Design a protein with these regions (language model features):
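N-terminal glycine/threonine-rich, aromatic-flanked beta-hairpin/loop signature
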Residues: 158-179
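Beta-loop motif signature
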Residues: 1-38, 78-112, 116, 155, ...
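A mature extracytoplasmic/lumenal domain signature
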Residues: 10, 34-36, 44-46, 60-62, ...
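Short, hydrophobic/aromatic-rich segments at coil-to-beta transitions
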Residues: 115, 147-154, 171-175
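Short beta-strand segments
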Residues: 22, 52-54, 95-97, 126-128, ...
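Boundary regions of SH3-family modules and the immediately adjacent low-complexity/disordered segments
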Residues: 29-31, 43-74, 118-152
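A short, polar/charged loop/turn motif at coil->beta-strand junctions and beta-hairpin connectors
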Residues: 71-73, 79, 168
Length: 179
């Protein structure tokens, strides 16, 4: 099998995990999420307790295999407190790098309680996961605000509407219910 360098962003100058030495072997299990330009976003196991999500050269795919294009958003956000960024949100949460309070980032996607972000430029460019709660979204109009809060939200304290869960609908209305 082959081994491929793994980068945190689709850019060979971006930060790499494992102190700059992150690699994946085609002998092991590799989950492919999708393609972005000449890159594949993949996840692979390092140990049973540690995985990594990152980018490899799309030539790693067998010629008869196809990967869908990644559908990532690009929403400006600001980090509201110092936080670690990880390339393994589901298992070890090993830090890839750190962000300080008030750092501007671009939110690309979300997965459970984690948001996939991009920050930095050139050799300090990276993508990784931060807890969604650390981000302050930048909202410029009401329609954007309504889109940003679509879905159901669990309320843990301080609900003045006597509901444990709020659901925000696309038309801007909301409903609340006791769960």
């Amino acid at each position: 099998g082959q081994t491929y360098a793994v980068y945190s962003a689709p850019d060979s100058r971006s930060i790499r995990g494992a102190k700059g030495r992150a690699r994946v072997s085609t002998n092991g299990w590799i989950q492919v999420f999708g393609a972005e330009g000449d890159w594949l976003l993949v996840q692979y196991a390092i140990t049973p307790e540690h995985c990594r999500i990152g980018y490899i050269d799309k030539n790693a795919l067998p010629q008869d295999a196809a990967a869908p294009a990644l559908a990532l958003e690009a929403v400006p956000a600001i980090v509201s407190y110092d936080v670690s960024v990880t390339d393994d949100p589901l298992m070890s949460q090993t830090p890839l790098t750190r962000l300080t309070e008030n750092t501007s980032v671009t939110a690309l996607a979300s997965m459970g309680d984690w948001t996939y972000i991009e920050a930095g430029t050139g050799k300090s460019r990276f993508r990784g996961f931060v807890p969604t709660e650390c981000l302050l979204g930048t909202v410029t109009d009401t329609r954007e605000a309504n889109r940003a809060i679509l879905g159901s939200w669990k309320l843990y304290a301080g609900s003045s509407v006597d509901a444990e869960q709020m659901t925000f609908l696309a038309d801007g209305s909301m409903t609340g219910c006791a769960v």
